[in-house]
Amino acid sequence: MNTTANPSNIIVGLSGGVDSSVTAALLKQQGYQVRGVFMQNWEDDDNDEYCSIKQDSFDAIAVADIIGIDIDIVNFAAQYKDKVFAYFLQEYSAGRTPNPDVLCNAEIKFKCFLDYAVGQGADTIATGHYARKEVRNGVHYLLKGLDRNKDQSYFLYRLKPFQLERAIFPLGGLEKPEVRRLAAEFKLPTAAKKDSTGICFIGERPFREFLQKYLPTDNGKMVTPEGKTVGEHVGLMFYTLGQRKGLGIGGAGEPWFVAAKDLTKNELIVVQGHDHPLLYTRSLVMNDLSFTLPERPKAGRYTCKTRYRMADAPCELRYLDDETAELVFDEPQWAVTPGQSAVLYDGDICLGGGIIQTTDKPVIITR
């Protein structure tokens, strides 16, 4: 297990899922003083059919009872709405596709929760993320999780050094089947609970239905790059680059994909074929840079992920100014999407990254 300097008092973020449950059980088994915290980060729909917050809190309490630890329920809903959800809506309004889970980690789980835990006298917080941490010459390095199918370092790239120093990831060296086996061995009620999917505050509800509650929609044309109308979209914010499903374009030939959004004309630009050149990018510009180490990485060669679970892509990092950098890829990358995060790696070390603003293709048109 990766720890800080001999922490004794650890507060675990218990989400009601199997990963955080096993995290708490392992730490208790290893002799640490462990407490749990269930974070209530969403309130708007906590009585509707799609919201799992109540069940998740019941599961977290049941896990704490079996393990034999205390648990607090702490409400961060106001902070979440201000720091995460407002940004989520702002980005969709601008035609981009944000990743709120990245911001939730940086602003809620490793800021609000960390501040709360320190205020309660904790030395360290622990979460069920599949990531690792190593301390080398006093520097805390964020590394990919051993289970490459579950590695979540991509979602943690905005953590600062002071946050990493206070965090541990007990599952980082385990694979998911082993975590399930341990949950059954500990007789935890979450052992067979399915993993959560989608954005945390949306849950299993239809995305379009959810977003329409908060943002106005405006139907428009689906057009080819040559300007031919081939269909109608139901609102640009409901589509993301590279999307194939749900376009409703008939006819023969290869499948259609979203290639760009023209915000001025309210048009969705679509192309036929997965290998259409407009879907491929050789470079991107990212801003709002954030790095996990005390010094930002030097310009040079690294690998990058522009979306979760993609294979690392070799690239060249070039700084444009203090807050902006360009990445130039060795090979064209498919469906690089503004609003998503570009995350840099040096081998297994997660260095940080930024928010994708533009690419060498006109994917968000605002002229």
Curated annotation (Swiss-Prot):
Disulfide cysteine pairs (residue numbers): C104-C200
Catalysed conversion reaction: S-sulfanyl-L-cysteinyl-[protein] + uridine(34) in tRNA + AH2 + ATP = 2-thiouridine(34) in tRNA + L-cysteinyl-[protein] + A + AMP + diphosphate + H(+)
Family annotation (InterPro entries): MnmA-like (IPR004506), MnmA-like_C (IPR046885), MnmA-like_central (IPR046884), MnmA-like_central_sf (IPR023382), Rossmann-like_a/b/a_fold (IPR014729)
Site description Interaction with tRNA, residues in chain: H129, Q340
Keyword Transmembrane helix: no
Record-level GO cellular component terms: cytoplasm
Binding positions for ATP per the UniProt entry: G13, L14, S15, G16, G17, V18, D19, S20, M39, G128
Known EC number: 2.8.1.13
Similarity-based family: Belongs to the MnmA/TRMU family.
Official protein name in the record: tRNA-specific 2-thiouridylase MnmA
Gene designation: mnmA
